[in-house]
Structure formats: C-alpha cells, structure tokens
Amino acid sequence: LTLSDGQYASCRKHGFEVRIRDCRTVTPEDYGTFDAIVSVGAFEHFCSLEEYKAGRQDEVYRNFFKTVSDLLPVGGRFYLQTMAFGPKMIGHEAMDIHADNNSDAYVMALAAKHLPGSWLPYGSEMITRNAEPYFKLINISNGRLDYIETIRRWRIMLRSFNVRKYTLY
C-alpha cells in the first residue's frame, strides 16, 4: 500500500501487487491478514502539527498500532522505521523560517513548510508507549548519524548545478 503515485508506478514496473490507499484505513475484511507488515518512512506523516497542538499525538499513534495489530495473525511481525525528535529538540513555538539556516528553529520551520500534515513523535519512548498494548518490542536502533549524513549529501546534490535536474522542472 502506498499514497505515492511514483512508488505505485515503480512497484507495478517491478511486478509487485500494489494499491494506492491510506494504510490506516485497511481492515482484515479488505485483504485478509498478513504474515508481516513493514512501514518505512510513513509513521512521521501520520500526525499533523495541528493534531499535536490539540494533544492528539498519542491517540493517532495508538490507532495506527491497533490497525496494524488487527491485520496480523498471532505471531505476525511488524517492522517500523521512522524518525523521531530527540530529547533536546526545541518546541514547535520556537520554529522560525528566518532563523540561521543551521539552527533547529530553521530546520523545524522548513520541515513544517515542506511537509504539511506531518509531525514527528517525541522520542522512541512515545512510539513504544503507544505500541505496547499491541506489540512486544524486539529491537530498537538509532540511525540518527546515518540520516544526518544522508541529509548532508542531499543538500550537496540539491544545491549543485545539473542540467537534467532543471529540465525536469
């Protein structure tokens, strides 16, 4: 399942069965249950800044974990890969698109501008607390430094001149 037309086209091209659909609305009646479910990079888009401000972040995450749990048989596996704010992250009220480009205030404002409807969970504790009624945690790892390097390389490539890149837009 995906919400991305590009991911849909790529999956079809490679012979996968795929549907465009919000995974949070799927029930066992739709497709049955699955032996395993993988979620990569979607979780951080399930809760909006508005829902966070309204105090609904935990509810949004609990509902997601219940939906996934309902789609798995006993003994089924779930893999979640997501980003989360660290313990030193500034509050949403400190976001400032005019702040220094290397500041948390700027990065947060930039993310809110370019990823509307998305707000990260606050730490792995928030994730595990909401998953706990439905899942047993087997492993947790932090790829923060890997992601920082990924972002660094993206910035270099995005800022570099490339004729093909400009013809696409």
Model-based region annotation:
Residues 2-6:
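Conserved SAM/SAH-binding beta-strand->alpha-helix loop
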Residues 8-11:
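Short alpha-helix immediately C-terminal to the canonical SAM-binding loop
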Residues 14-27:
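Conserved SAM-binding strand-loop segment of SAM-dependent methyltransferases
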Residues 24-40, 44-46:
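A short acidic, Gly/Pro-enriched loop at the edge of an enzyme's catalytic core
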Residues 47, 72-73, 132:
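Short conserved AdoMet
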Residues 54-75:
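A short glycine-rich, Lys/Arg-flanked "PGG" loop and its adjoining helix->strand segment in the class I
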Residues 78-79:
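A short hydrophobic/small-residue beta-strand
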Residues 83-169:
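Substrate-binding/catalytic lobe of Class I Rossmann-like enzymes that use SAM or dcSAM, i.e.
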